[in-house]
Design a protein with these regions (language model features):
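A short acidic/small-residue loop/turn micro-motif
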Residues: 107-108
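Alpha-helix boundary/capping and short turn/kink residues
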Residues: 22-25, 41, 83
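Short amphipathic alpha-helical segments enriched in hydrophobics
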Residues: 20, 24, 55-58
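Short histidine/acidic/glycine/proline-rich micro-motifs that form metal-
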Residues: 35-38, 79
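Short, low-complexity N-terminal intrinsically disordered segments enriched in polar/charged residues
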Residues: 1-22, 30, 34
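Surface-exposed, charged secondary-structure patches
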Residues: 44, 48-96, 104
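Hydrophobic pocket/interface hotspot
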Residues: 16, 27-29, 36, 47, ...
Length: 108
């Protein structure tokens, strides 16, 4: 059962999902620390290239099915124009200032 984005527990993660689904690059980038990093399927990736390819140029969209770890871990159906839909897991490191310094995703 899908969790409505507005009901996600962690404010930074909620804003992340909202920005992805709205295809709002500026809002997305404002959620990240200047030195933010990410990994996909266990491999570190270039953040700028990855978000362009996997989210913004391919119309990425997240439907969250479950959250854990205080809202900083998600199980979601992620879809984009490149890969179609897949079950994915997401983990977030949120700093004291509320910005995301690291996120990881991969197939669930």
């Amino acid at each position: 059962m899908t969790i409505q984005t507005g009901r996600l527990t962690d404010p930074a993660v909620r804003a992340f999902v909202s920005a992805v689904n709205a295809h709002d690059r500026q809002a997305f980038l404002s959620l990240l620390t200047p030195d933010a990093t990410m990994a996909d399927d266990g491999s570190d990736r270039d953040l700028a290239e990855w978000i362009d390819r996997e989210i913004f140029s391919s119309h990425g969209h997240m439907e969250v099915d479950r959250e854990s770890d205080g809202g900083r871990a998600l199980l979601a159906r992620y879809s984009n124009d490149t890969w179609g839909e897949m079950r994915t897991k997401w983990r977030f490191v949120v700093e004291d200032d509320g910005r995301i310094s690291h996120f990881e995703t991969g197939q669930a």
